[in-house]
UniProtKB/Swiss-Prot annotation:
Locations listed in the record: Nucleus
Ranges where the record places region Interaction with DNA: 380-389, 427-430
Gene Ontology biological process: epidermis development; positive regulation of transcription by RNA polymerase II
PANTHER family tied to this protein: GRAINYHEAD-LIKE PROTEIN 1 HOMOLOG, TRANSCRIPTION FACTOR CP2
Note: GRHL genes (GRHL1, GRHL2 and GRHL3) show a paradoxical lack of redundancy despite their extensive sequence identity in the DNA-binding and protein dimerization domains and the fact that the core consensus DNA binding sites are identical. They have related but remarkably different functions during embryogenesis because of their differential spatiotemporal expression patterns during development.
Protein name: Grainyhead-like protein 1 homolog
Phosphothreonine sites (modified residues): 208
Family: Belongs to the grh/CP2 family. Grainyhead subfamily.
Entry keyword annotation includes Phosphoprotein: yes
Keyword terms of this UniProt record: Activator, Developmental protein, DNA-binding, Nucleus, Phosphoprotein, Transcription, Transcription regulation
Length: 618
């Protein structure tokens, strides 16, 4: 008896869903297979299936074909000596309801898929506890059942020693350890009330050839139930029905490694001190309860940005950013930068500078990611008034999941910062430590953190509001070259495979979201760029500032002529000597794009009534 069951392999016949229209329904297995007999399974058909690598399917289909070609009377008489199974008592067995679905079997639909001992994980709906007896019945809501479909021929068939398993369930990250020899089928359409003994119809009709058989395990002995005992179908699933793991909104943790203030008021956010332009590590990781479980789509997209801590309107925020940008020595100065450290780039990918105050990147939640961020603006840089308190700033991180297609982040957290210049963060910490040591414990009204217990790791505080859109700052002069309004939400899964993919348009508010006439904005983009050069003669120590009216070679000649009294019409050639010693003819392109705010030493040579000018780069 045991040898007979050793030759059994699970074969699952799946319906073809909506690929073919339903033609007719059959009331018995014999009637269904009569249509198959009209289209014989020839040797050529078996050969084609074998060539395509589906030898097991060809063998299973041939077995079923030979079985139903025998008349029903002869089949019943010959089957009795082999296996004798009395009609089971349904009151004593666990009954699984029959899903009343019409099979889609016809001459053109003979598709058989052989599952080689593949373990499936079934997650039954949570509901009422299933009261079951001791005969291997379902005892908890999350239960496994074993399904066997067809008996393979007695000749040897190559099987795997270690079957490959995959999980089907909601969510996939939930893992239920099961023995490798169990085969479990998941049916999303089953409810808890269907798993009662009364759910089985008294006269359940026989299923068509794609019916399944059930096997249970009783003290190590395999017990087989045939179609009259159990019939379980796996429904067809469209691509829209596949449910991937959705990253929940509270299972991320971000930490900033920087000095924290010693004076923390109860209820207030932790204040972290940073130095302007210094890079600090930020660690991102998932802290879900199911540690060690790898997600099917594990990549997420995070946006790290510098925003104002106070609740301000978008117009006020943009006005402050514009004022800060106008006071910078170069138009390319950004509010936030990311370092290209090897430690960081081994854990993140697809880095995009989506705005002057925001950087986005992709990372895998199965691993810990680390980025190094610097903030280039002080809290006092947003106002022209002296002696006023600076605006509080936050480092905010929004994380978007590739598993949903919503523009709303799945997680948002922030950390309040105060930025100092010239190592001011360390001086501020020393001042607080000195004041703390001088203050008597009895006079302390605000709780202070002892210096020896002070932690240098700040955990970002989760933000409940996920609907408010942060403002991204992109100056007008760079709209033409920068990806405008670029957002981090993945639209297609193809981005997972390519590094540096172009991001899609998203909902973040940028400067072009406000009521500005398009024609006026276009005019600002096309305004000529001003070029400033610092020039001195060889005998001088102080540089002269040459502001070119037009960023061209003609504008450079006019500026030199006005500054050094060189006749404009007698200037012949202008050369640029690079630091490498290369002598290059100056043209409009070099003046416009490669000379702004550069320092030069000017050489003026007169020969034959004309002047040759050489700008030596310093």
């Amino acid at each position: 008896m045991t040898q007979e069951y050793d030759n059994k392999r699970p074969v699952l016949v799946l319906q073809n869903e909506a690929l073919y229209p339903q033609r007719r329904s059959y009331t018995s297995e014999d009637e269904a297979w009569k249509s198959f007999l009209e289209n014989p399974l020839t040797a050529a058909t078996k050969a084609m299936m074998s060539i395509n690598g589906d030898e097991d399917s060809a063998a299973a289909l041939g077995l079923l074909y030979d079985y139903y070609k025998v008349p029903r009377e002869r089949r019943s008489s010959t089957a009795k000596p082999e296996v004798e199974h009395p009609e089971p008592d349904h009151s004593k067995r666990n009954s699984i309801p029959i899903v009343t679905e019409q099979p889609l079997i016809s001459a053109g639909e003979n598709r058989v898929q052989v599952l080689k001992n593949v373990p499936f994980n079934i997650v039954l709906p949570h509901g009422n506890q299933l009261g079951i007896d001791k005969r291997g019945h379902l005892t908890v809501p999350d239960t496994t059942v074993t399904v066997s479909i067809a008996t393979m021929p007695t000749h040897s068939i190559k099987t795997e020693t270690q079957p490959h398993g995959f999980t089907v369930g909601i969510p996939p990250a939930v893992y239920h350890p099961e023995p490798t020899e169990r085969v479990v089928v998941f049916d999303r359409n089953l409810s808890t009330d269907q798993f009662s003994s009364g759910a089985q119809a008294p006269n359940a009709q026989r299923r068509t050839p794609d019916s399944t058989f059930s096997e249970t395990f009783k003290e190590g002995v395999q017990e087989v139930f045939f179609p009259s005992d159990l019939s379980l179908r796996m429904p067809g699933m469209n691509s829209e029905d596949y449910v991937f793991d959705s990253v929940s909104g509270n299972n991320f943790e971000y930490t900033l490694e920087a000095s924290k203030s010693l004076r923390q008021k109860p209820g207030d956010s932790t204040m972290t001190y940073l130095n302007k332009g210094q890079f600090y590590p930020i660690t991102l990781k998932e802290v879900s309860s199911n540690e060690g479980i790898h997600h099917p789509i594990s990549k997420v997209r995070s946006v790290t940005m510098v925003v104002f801590a106070e609740d301000k309107s978008r117009e006020d925020q943009l006005r402050h950013w514009k004022y800060w940008h106008s006071r910078q020595h170069t138009a390319k100065q950004r509010c936030i930068d990311i370092a290209d450290y090897k430690e960081s780039f081994n854990t993140i990918s697809n880095i995009e500078e989506i705005a002057y105050n925001a950087i986005s990147f992709t990372w895998d939640i199965n691993d810990e990611a680390k980025v190094f961020i610097s903030v280039n603006c002080l809290s006092t840089d947003f106002s022209s008034q002296k002696g006023v308190k600076g605006l509080p700033l936050n480092i905010q991180i929004d994380t978007y999941s590739y598993n949903n297609r919503s523009n709303k982040p799945v997680h948002r957290a922030y950390c309040q910062i105060k930025v100092f210049c010239d190592k001011g963060a360390e001086r501020k910490i020393r001042d607080e430590e000195r004041k703390q040591s001088k203050r008597k414990v009895s006079d302390v009204k605000v709780p202070l953190l002892p210096s020896h217990k002070r932690m240098d790791i700040t955990v970002f505080k989760p933000f409940i509001d996920l609907d408010t859109q942060p403002v991204l700052f992109i100056p007008d002069v760079h709209f033409a070259s920068l990806q405008r309004g670029t957002h981090v939400l993945p639209i297609a899964s193809e981005e997972l495979e390519g590094e540096g993919s172009v991001l899609k348009r998203g909902p973040y508010s940028t400067e072009d979201d406000f009521a500005v006439p398009p024609s006026a904005k276009l005019a600002r983009i096309e305004e000529p760029k001003r070029v400033l050069l610092y020039v001195r003669k060889e005998s001088e120590e102080v540089f002269d500032a040459l502001m070119l009216k037009t960023p061209s070679l003609k504008g450079l000649m006019e500026a030199i002529s006005d500054k050094y009294d060189v006749p404009h019409d007698k200037i012949g050639k202008i050369f640029k000597k690079c630091k490498k010693g290369i002598l290059v003819n100056m043209d409009d392109n070099i003046v416009k794009h490669y000379s702004n705010e550069d320092t030069f030493q000017l050489q003026i040579e007169e020969a034959g009534g004309s002047y040759k000018l050489t700008l030596i780069e310093i």
